[in-house]
Amino acid sequence: MIAYNKIELEKAAKQAGFVRDTFEKVLRLKEVLKYINSDAYLREHLALKGGTAINMTIFNLPRLSVDIDLDFTPNLSKDDTQMHRKQITEQLCEYMEESGYYRSESSRYSHSLDAFLFLYQNAGGNRAVSYTHLRAHETR
């Protein structure tokens, strides 16, 4: 996990006009997105959507999104979709755990949406939560 310095974060957040803890969370989310983009399997099966996608790729909006919304993109059978979602879940959770995050028991899983909540200790020493949502669209 990247070690974020409280003083440096405070300075950068203030210059950008944001609260330090929210600013740190967005930096952490960007690292997760970099990982997803660097992995061929994840990049092939997932699409970033929602406010984070718009803010980080199209516009330079003065808004900090604090979650990641992903869509499972292949058009597969229910069984194949479930198999790939299982692999994606394992890869994402392994990366997050290796990066110092802990999966919360409040994470939720259903046939159409997985909502991962990952806990970490922020630069201020507080426990914080990172959200990742994975939507799957089973079509056959």
Q: For the regions a protein language model found, what residue spans apply to each?
A:
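Helical scaffold of the NTase/Pol beta-like nucleotidyltransferase catalytic core
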Residues: M1-A47, Q87, Q91
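Glycine-/proline-rich flexible loop or hinge segments
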Residues: A12-G17, I68-D79
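Short alpha-helical segments and helix-capping/turn motifs at coil-helix boundaries
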Residues: E31-Y35, D114-L119
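Active-site nucleotide-donor binding segment shared across nucleotidyl transfer reactions
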Residues: N37-I68, P74
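Short, glycine/charge-rich beta-strand/loop segments that flank catalytic centers
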Residues: L48-T52, R103-F118
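Metal-dependent nucleotidyltransferase catalytic core
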Residues: F72-S110
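Short acidic, glycine-rich loop/turn motifs
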Residues: L119-G125
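Conserved small/polar residues in nucleotide/adenosyl-binding loops
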Residues: T132-T139
